[in-house]
Design a protein with these regions (language model features):
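Short, well-ordered amphipathic alpha-helical segments that serve as non-catalytic structural scaffolds
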Residues: 26-42, 65-69, 94, 161-168, ...
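Conserved catalytic cysteine-centered active-site region
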Residues: 55-110, 142-144, 155-161, 226-252, ...
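Flexible glycine-/small-residue-enriched beta->alpha junction loops
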Residues: 109-167
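Active-site-proximal alpha-helical scaffold in enzymes
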Residues: 86-116, 169-198, 259-266, 331-332, ...
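Conserved beta-ketoacyl condensing-enzyme motif
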Residues: 22-110, 115-134, 203-218, 290, ...
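Condensing-enzyme catalytic core mediating Claisen C-C bond formation in acyl metabolism
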Residues: 1-25, 143, 229-294, 298, ...
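Active-site pocket-lining segment
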Residues: 164-166, 199-202, 209-210, 280-349
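N-terminal extracellular/periplasmic Venus flytrap/periplasmic-binding protein-like
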Residues: 11-12, 22-32, 40, 178-265, ...
Length: 396
């Protein structure tokens, strides 16, 4: 079994919903990080064996969005690739699939990541529109929101993920004060990291054309440095009338892309690459669909057991803040201390472009390990319909 190494990373700044990246399609965003990572690694596109990218909200954007992105990035059309849809875990599973290709000897060099434009998610009519409406009496046709229907709703329970998380929070006895505290520290940490220039090594700035000219977007748009516990406490519940979750302690709807270049020893020697980290392995697990926020817990336990590790062995942990509840569960159930968890913020402050985040977490984890001189890192996240994934890395 061969080893798989991360040799380069890149991500876009994360754009707010309807913000600076709203005119960029998912393939535009993907192309940007593909091009950036090849430039950073100083290799041609034809060196790749494959590209694998996560994407969820693809309706109306055409066939095989990662291949569209690759062509835009100048990767030769003789290099093929595919998309992964595992909802929020899409980007992470893309990295895991690339790792499996490398370790099995099927590929030497694979580009993996995720891309999502939640701002460009459209609306759709049901199949009834194709065959004609004979009568609408009693059966009105409504436009459905692709973002809500394909991205944020559990079809098994026919329930939004926010209200499902409210149910889980009630079961665990999680309070409004606890989730607001998570949100406060998320913004505080992200704002401090941005002010210190920590994300500059990750972000490939994007030129944004406006009526006033061209501007350079080089920072994440969703961070609110002025967030306080008092301002969070004033927000109304977002999903249930008496709930604890608000727009302030749930992840942001966002746009963005992230990529990692994964290589074996042969590719490293052939192209004179410098490995950043070794991918120890990945895992996945699933629970009842409405309990999705719990799913990273068994995924992490499975990963740790397989590689004879303890959760305490990891120097840093990135677990996506789909909701602040996720952070509390990682702390309570796995014993991850807050000083190791999401040290630069996460989905609440940085944003959560769903098909991208799984890859973005690994990119940011590597930044943290480098800055903190840590050795072992863990990235994990939940995904809609009850699943979760986890990846462990060793910084070199």
């Amino acid at each position: 079994m061969q080893e798989a190494y991360i040799v380069s990373t890149a991500r876009t700044p994360i754009g707010r919903f309807g913000g600076g990246l709203k005119e960029f399609s998912p393939s535009d965003l993907g192309a940007h990080v593909m091009k950036a990572i090849l430039q950073r690694a100083n290799i041609p596109g034809d060196a790749l064996d494959m590209y694998i990218f996560g994407n969820v909200l693809r309706a109306g954007h055409g066939q095989l969005i990662p291949r569209q992105a690759a062509v835009k990035a100048g990767i030769p059309q003789t290099i093929d690739g595919y998309a992964v849809d595992m909802v929020c875990s899409s980007g992470m599973m893309s990295v895991m699939n690339a790792t499996m290709m490398i370790k099995s000897g099927e590929a030497d060099l694979v580009l993996a990541g995720g891309m999502e434009s939640m701002s460009q998610a459209g609306f759709f009519l049901s199949h009834r529109a194709r065959w004609g409406y004979k009568f609408l009496l009693g059966k009105p046709e409504q436009l459905k929101d692709v973002l809500e229907y394909d991205g944020l709703t559990d079809p098994i329970e026919d329930e939004g993920m926010g209200s499902e998380t409210e149910r889980l929070a009630a079961e665990y006895g999680i309070t409004r004060e606890e989730v607001d505290e998570v949100a406060y520290y998320s913004h505080k940490r992200a704002a401090e990291a941005t002010a210190q220039g920590i994300f500059k090594t990750e972000i490939a700035p994007v030129e944004v054309k406006t009526r006033k000219g061209t501007t350079l977007l080089d920072e994440d748009e969703g961070i609110r440095p002025d967030t306080t516990p008092e301002s969070l406490a004033k927000l109304r519940p977002a999903f249930t009338s008496d709930g604890i979750l608000t727009a302030g302690n749930a992840s942001q709807i966002s746009d963005g892309a992230a990529a990692l270049l994964i290589a074996n020893d042969a590719a490293i020697k052939r192209y004179d690459l410098t490995p950043i980290a070794r991918i120890i392995g990945g895992s996945w697990a699933a629970v009842d669909s409405w309990r999705f926020a719990e799913a990273p817990i068994p995924a992490v336990r499975k990963l740790a057991a397989k590689h004879k590790l303890d959760v305490a062995d990891f120097d840093l942990v990135e677990n996506n803040e789909a909701f602040a509840v996720n952070t509390i569960l990682m702390n309570r159930e796995l014993g991850v201390p807050t000083e190791k968890l999401n040290i630069y913020g996460s989905g609440i402050s940085l944003g959560h472009p769903i098909g991208c985040t799984g890859a973005r977490l690994i990119v940011t984890l590597l930044t943290g390990l480098q800055n903190e001189q840590g050795k072992l890192g863990l990235a994990s996240l939940c995904h809609g319909m009850g699943g979760g994934t986890a990846v462990a890395v060793e910084r070199l």
